[in-house]
Amino acid sequence: MNEADARPTNFIRQIIDEDLATGKHNSVHTRFPPEPNGYLHIGHAKSICLNFGIAQDYQGKCNLRFDDTNPVKEDVEYINSIQKDVQWLGFQWDGNVHYSSDYFDQLYQYAIELINKGLAYVDELSAEEIREYRGTLKEPGKNSPYRSRSVEENLALFEKMRAGGFEEGKACLRAKIDMASPFIVMRDPVLYRIKFAEHHQTGNKWCIYPMYDFTHCISDALENITHSLCTLEFQDNRRLYDWVLDNITIPCHPRQYEFSRLNLEYTVMSKRKLNQLVTENIVDGWDDPRMPTISGLRRRGYTAESIREFCQRIGVTKQDNNVEMASLEACIRDDLNENAPRAMAVIDPVRLVIENMPEGEEILTAPNHPNKPEMGTREVPFSREIYIDRADFKEEANRQYKRLVLGKEVRLRNAYVIKAERVEKDEQGEITTIYCTYDPQTLNKDPADGRKVKGVIHWVSIPHAIPAEIRLYDRLFSVPNPGAEEDFLSTINPESLVIRQGFVEASLKDAAIEKAYQFEREGYFCADKLSTADKLVFNRTVGLRDTWAKISKQG
């Protein structure tokens, strides 16, 4: 199989293959054009992987262009975070970063060209009146009383707009197309509006700003984009995209192709809703590990490789569909199962004393990965007092319980076989200490007399245990499609974050931020950005097994 055969295929790649085969294009040039008004989320990751991935596979180019035409909502903070996210995902844009604002002078001249051709006019209807005049899907729109202005009058009024001669909302530039069009987007769409706001790139040079539909197609053309890829909600906008380029003097005419957006269950993708979660302090910022933002996923412990794999698995189609959270989790679980070093952590600790073990410590050797000897080993201190997880002990249990039971044996991971002899309880009847004996001949081997010990549990030596805050993250919402609810905040999962105070083994003392580990028998975790030498904090990335099938049945 050659490299081309190994590439993922989809309808967009088939179009590109045909364009190259017929000579329509000699090379491929795509772009990723986010608006810098928020943090990127997993849906943007799909677009990033598509646009940059196509450029890579076809030895082409992909631009990063900020669609910065609304200075009121934009911020340099978002520009910086978006660049970081793209690079973290493993991609690099061609040349310098582009901005739609780079083209404001040309866009203004193209607007004048449309006015000169009688294809644009200055309208003084209010925004509400424009909506009323636009009509509905069943009723055609009505012409604005300002639609018949002369070219000369429109040129003068447009210049007045630019010079700040109108208040915000008192005038706009509209395309003159067809108020009876069956496509509402073609009913004289607004091309320019007035905003007295300082722009992060152009300062106070402009008080009129072009609309997305006017800016987007011209920016594509000026950058010689061959294939302009966007999500399905822009399907009708393609008519306006082509109309603008057909009616101005510009040599390049890119084509727009639409694909389905990513809808992930148990979360929301709307920037407005995500912003509400942040501003109402329901989450801890845009990078809260429960957020679907790339920065949130990164903080939770997702790797760039797992997100790229997820985007490849879900594919590119024209049909909208909901993707199960299990699909995303399967990608990170597969990645970390293969690559994450193992460690031991006790999340709900109970003290265990091995009465027949001498004082002091014994240094044991544990593999960093059971199937990858090349990942080496680590030293794990063992002593007569250890922590085990409270759920790993019962005074009485049936045969299905393969952990420690009073009067029975279990193996300690990478250590010895122990037997529970007795327990100590507090006044409330809560077990405070489990007293055991151990078989010193069973270090990583079966008992000499042939008796079978089936269960294995993890542990941490108390004298060497490091206190850690363990953050158990779950889905943020309790219903699969919270965005469809009348009040999406009413569906917040109250157990989306459970904090435990536990202990981790000594080797994790210097765990690097975002470094992934498998806490044996517990799941995959990473050190949080709030983790310090004095207070370790670990985030659960994902459990060891898929819990979504069970959740789906319950739902």
UniProtKB/Swiss-Prot annotation:
Annotated organism of origin: Proteus mirabilis (strain HI4320)
Record EC number: 6.1.1.18
One of the GO biological process terms: glutaminyl-tRNA aminoacylation
Cellular compartment(s): Cytoplasm
Database matches in PANTHER family: GLUTAMATE--TRNA LIGASE, GLUTAMINE-TRNA LIGASE
Pfam families: tRNA-synt_1c, tRNA-synt_1c_C, tRNA-synt_1c_C2
Gene that encodes the chain: glnS
PROSITE patterns documented for this protein: AA_TRNA_LIGASE_I
Protein name, UniProt field: Glutamine--tRNA ligase
